[in-house]
UniProtKB/Swiss-Prot annotation:
It comes from Saccharomyces cerevisiae (strain ATCC 204508 / S288c) (Baker's yeast). Residues 20-31, 149-160, 732-758 have a biased composition (Polar residues). InterPro entries: Kinase-like_dom_sf, Prot_kinase_dom, Protein_kinase_ATP_BS, Ser/Thr_kinase_AS, Ser_Thr_dual-spec_kinase. The gene is YAK1. Keywords: ATP-binding, Cytoplasm, Kinase, Nucleotide-binding, Nucleus, Phosphoprotein, Serine/threonine-protein kinase, Transferase, Tyrosine-protein kinase. This is Dual specificity protein kinase YAK1. GO terms for biological process: cAMP/PKA signal transduction; positive regulation of cell-substrate adhesion; positive regulation of DNA-templated transcription. Negative regulator of the cell cycle acting downstream of the cAMP-dependent protein kinase. Part of a glucose-sensing system involved in growth control in response to glucose availability. Phosphorylates POP2. It is found in: Cytoplasm; Nucleus. It catalyses: L-seryl-[protein] + ATP = O-phospho-L-seryl-[protein] + ADP + H(+); L-threonyl-[protein] + ATP = O-phospho-L-threonyl-[protein] + ADP + H(+); L-tyrosyl-[protein] + ATP = O-phospho-L-tyrosyl-[protein] + ADP + H(+).
Length: 807
């Protein structure tokens, strides 16, 4: 700037200082010797002791003083805008700028502007006047922990004298002083333009902030004593928010950047293309940069980690008052649906108690079971994983529905488990579930059990529904048979034996336990007729015949076959489809069962004499068309999961494990084990419940005892009932059963004690052998025979006249 501008600036500063004096005097009337001059001192030569001025100031009211002070400030601002001139200095220590186009990109119409023109011509500029340097990637964040202090020797303005300034600000002041672009007396002016705003250094530093150098000495202190501690500012706008990243000796090629900007760059506008298929897509893979903002080599914290894994720490840094406790988390609901509809809002529409995580059960009866998670949900209610807050033990709690029918059934289960745990199996050796406690919570019966692992169905699912090894099947079958032996001796029926109700004690041990005695009953009190899950339902239940503990043996046979095959052997979609699958695989049940069954007429059709293929075949299964037409339902044909229909063929032709496919010796051993398994399944899957093996008999089979299987095996001391002169009805039923085995429709069926049929042969049952073994039968009705204790309504002569003597 020229000297005239300097004089104007100095005069404006003096006027500003003089204009502040009246306010200072009026605010401090007692300090009359303050040495400040009135606005008239420069013209009248009077000091502050002018009586007219003192009297005039003392007579003014505070409101008038405030208005005058406001008017004076407006005049000062207008005078400053008129007197201040714009001065730009190259911040990168380039040669002295004489023409604005040498370092600024201005339109042609401003070429003739000289340095004395007003700044008003430049207010319309929207583009940045300075091209900022590139930011350094992956900086060291500890570099900005502290800045070199920049303090002034003058403390006339206390509010601005204690701040710290970065070295970039000092660097610019040093360059401006060395170039002589501004007179030293103007360094104290607050309107000298600067690249730096003090607010820029109070903002949060970026992860890629620039590198400030502190290799420059501070400015001389012999500047204007009034405002030398205020940072140099631009009157209207900051030129750039980014200070230079290098020191003057290492000048970056900014000339090339400005030259490119003058020449202009072509903008790449993205174009939209129609894509009809994925082949039209042409993705561009950008190369990964060598250095990233948040890398393993940098000391910065990844923003992604700070807002995810370390979110609590981030909140704590932002607000010291922030606290977090997991106990205050909203409780996660475990029951679906979770809307309260019954029981004062505690139950949903299905009468299930609405459970939440961290709920405490049993408080009303001095129990404390903390709910952790849900284990399962069924028709009876829910099973949740809980912790006993008194003993710190992890348990399973069964929360029964609040309906009366489910409550009655659960009370029966609790009584049976109490009988098993305390009297029948107090030593916990026979693989029964242990019940520890029972209580009522919000009108719901809660049973506390030991916590077990996965069930057998989940085990098959983990094995991708491939069959297990015969050795593991033998281990599981032995434990289940041990439990069934205890139940038969106690005259108890489980009534719902299936893979879902057989649980592993631990995921790494082949130890089992039987659960869910909610459907259990005593042999003498068989009240319900619709029991068992469909896949494992015995034929006598489907036909409507009185049942006994033999139905559990049928379920065991279905479970063993499923463990070997990986899928259920009889996956019926309905009762009609279930009975169809059983007959296709094992043959027709004996005629006395069909005649005696209450539901036989629903699935069977009695043959006319001319339609019967033999004198003993009196019934046949209804076709799908006949069954659907009669009951007005839609029944789909059975889906075949196996290539073969008969049980022996299914077992023999099941795929070999990969571990033995290359060894003929291992294959021969596998086939021998399969023949033993076929014979075992033939005994427990006998359609006749009177001839079906008991648990005690099955425990002696070579498949369980690992004895050598020669192809023939009979339970020790067992005998089959045969024709008897005393019991004509029994004779007719047995002869009818034996002759039915001769029909070609039952060829290949594995009948109970015939070894040839167990190997898949078509020979009929040897009636002579059966007649010889009948001599060992006793004439008295055995009280141990289960069916005699479960007789319901209807004819029972066949059950009362047949008997088996058990050891």
């Amino acid at each position: 700037m020229n000297s005239s501008n300097n004089n104007d600036s100095s005069s404006s500063n003096s006027n500003m200082n003089n204009s502040l004096s009246p306010t200072l005097v009026t605010h401090s009337d007692a300090s009359m010797g303050s040495g400040r001059a009135s606005p008239d001192n420069s013209h009248m030569g009077r000091g502050i002791w002018n009586p007219s001025y003192v009297n005039q100031g003392s007579q003014r009211s505070p409101q008038q003083q405030h208005q005058n002070h406001h008017q004076q400030q407006q005049q000062q601002q207008q005078q400053q805008q008129q007197n201040s001139q714009f001065c730009f200095v190259n911040p990168w220590n380039e040669e002295k700028v004489t023409n604005s186009q040498q370092n600024l990109v201005y339109p042609p119409q401003y070429d003739d502007l000289n340095s004395n023109e007003s700044l008003d011509a430049y207010r319309r500029r929207k583009s940045s006047l300075v091209v900022p340097p590139a930011r350094a990637p992956a900086p060291n964040p500890f570099q900005y922990d502290s800045y070199p202090a920049y303090t002034s020797s003058n403390t006339s303005l206390a509010g601005n004298s204690s701040g710290q300034y970065p070295s970039g600000y000092q660097q610019q002041q040093q360059q401006v002083y060395q170039q002589g672009a501004i007179h030293p007396s103007q360094f104290g002016s607050r309107f000298v333009p600067s690249l730096y705003d003090r607010q820029d250094f109070q903002r949060r530093q970026s992860l890629a902030a620039t590198n400030y150098s502190s290799n420059f000495s501070s400015l001389n202190s012999n500047t204007n004593q009034g405002t030398n501690s205020i940072p140099v500012m631009s009157p209207y706008r900051r030129l750039s928010a980014y200070p230079p990243s290098t020191s003057p000796p290492l000048q970056p090629p900014f000339k090339q950047l400005r030259r490119d900007e003058v020449q202009g760059q072509k903008l790449s506008i993205p174009q939209m293309q129609l894509c009809n298929s994925k082949n039209d897509l042409q993705p561009v893979l950008n190369a990964t940069p060598k250095f990233r903002r948040a890398s393993l080599n940098s000391k910065t914290i990844s923003p992604l980690v700070s807002v995810t894994k370390s979110l609590i720490t981030t909140y704590s840094l932002c607000s010291p008052e922030f606290t977090y406790q997991t106990s205050k988390n909203p409780k996660r609901v475990l029951t679906k649906p979770s809307e309260g509809k019954c029981n004062n809002g505690f139950d949903n529409i299905n009468s299930d108690y609405i459970l939440y995580v961290n709920d405490v059960l049993g408080v009303e009866q001095n129990r404390k079971y903390l709910v952790l998670d849900i284990l399962g949900q069924g028709t009876f209610g829910q099973v949740v994983k809980c912790q006993n807050l008194l003993t710190k033990e992890i348990l399973a709690v069964k929360v029964v529905k609040s309906r009366t029918e489910y409550l009655t059934q659960s009370i029966t289960e609790a009584k049976i488990l109490e009988l098993l745990n305390q009297k029948i199996d107090p030593t916990n050796k026979h693989h029964f579930l242990r019940m520890y406690d029972s209580f009522v919570h919000k009108n719901h019966l809660c049973l506390v059990f030991e916590l077990l692992s996965n069930n057998l169905y989940e085990l098959l699912k983990q094995n991708k529904f491939h069959g297990l090894s015969i050795q593991l099947i033998r281990t599981f079958t032995t434990q289940i048979l041990d439990s069934l032996c205890v139940l038969k001796e106690s005259k108890l029926i489980h009534c719902d034996l299936k893979p879902e109700n057989i649980l592993l004690c631990a995921p790494d041990k082949p130890e089992l336990k039987i659960i869910d005695f909610g459907s259990s009953c005593e042999e003498a009190r068989t009240v319900y007729t619709y029991i068992q899950s469909r896949f494992y339902r015995a034929p006598e239940i489907i036909l409507g015949i009185p049942y006994s503990t033999s139905i559990d043996m049928w379920s065991l046979g279905c479970i063993v076959a499923e463990l070997f095959l990986g899928i259920p052997i009889f996956p019926g979609a309905s009762e009609y489809n279930q009975l169809t699958r059983i007959i296709d695989t094992l043959g027709y049940p004996p005629s006395w069962m069909i005649d005696m069954g209450k539901n036989s007429g629903k699935f069977m059709k009695k043959l006319a004499p001319e339609e019967s293929s033999s004198s003993t075949q009196k019934h046949r299964m209804k076709t799908i068309e006949e069954f659907c037409r009669e009951y007005n339902i839609v029944e789909k044909p059975s889906k075949q999961y196996f290539k073969w229909r008969k049980l022996p063929d299914i077992i023999r032709n099941y795929r070999y494990p990969k571990s033995i496919q290359n060894s003929q010796e291992l294959i021969d051993q596998e086939m021998q084990n399969r023949e033993c398994l076929i014979h075992f399944l033939g005994g427990v899957l006998n359609l006749n419940p009177l001839e079906r093996w008991t648990p005690q008999q099955a425990m002696l089979h070579p498949f369980i005892t690992k004895q050598e299987f020669t192809g023939e095996w009979f339970p020790p001391g067992s005998s089959l009932p045969g024709p008897s002169e005393k019991h004509d009805d029994a004779k007719g039923q047995q002869s009818e059963y034996g002759s039915a085995n001769d029909s070609s429709n039952n060829a290949g069926h594995n009948y109970v004690y015939n070894p040839s049929s167990a190997t898949g042969g078509a020979d009929s049952v040897d009636i002579g052998a059966i007649s010889k073994r009948k001599e060992n039968t006793s004439g008295d009705i055995s009280n141990n025979f289960a069916v005699t204790h479960s007789v319901q309504e209807g004819p029972t002569s066949a059950f009362n006249k047949l008997h088996i003597v058990e050891e």
